[in-house]
């Protein structure tokens, strides 16, 4: 599993990190018995479907120690995985009480409490600026940019996993937003991509 994580994250991964993520997986499986944290159909492939899929995002951080915000973190995917692999502060935004409590308990249990912050709130109420903004399956791209743009500064990187509708979402978003974009192939799903956006700004209305 070390080799798979290193390929996904494009960086060395220690055995201690693998053990931490293994404990995270066990906590996810246990909690999913009472909460719908991840789809039951994906529990058998949780490493490939969720852990490695999240791990690949750290390769897009602009510099070591970058600050991350994971919007709609839910089960801690990708935020907890990013915190395990990266060195910078990670903020998890989750409005649902039970899931926010799961994130708080999990971060503390994994020894990530000093690195990870949980905000139980809707995205619109969150304040601050972050070096990297990420989210999995929260909203179509254009709407998500509108929801989260207040959290970006001029050099913020947006690292957003997308499925087969990535191109159509991007085309729709470009009606209202300007940005530089790279479409990177997912290392876990041949039908998926990671949209990496920079210099995101709203187009002026005419």
Located regions from the model:
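S-adenosylmethionine
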Residues: 79-81, 91-206
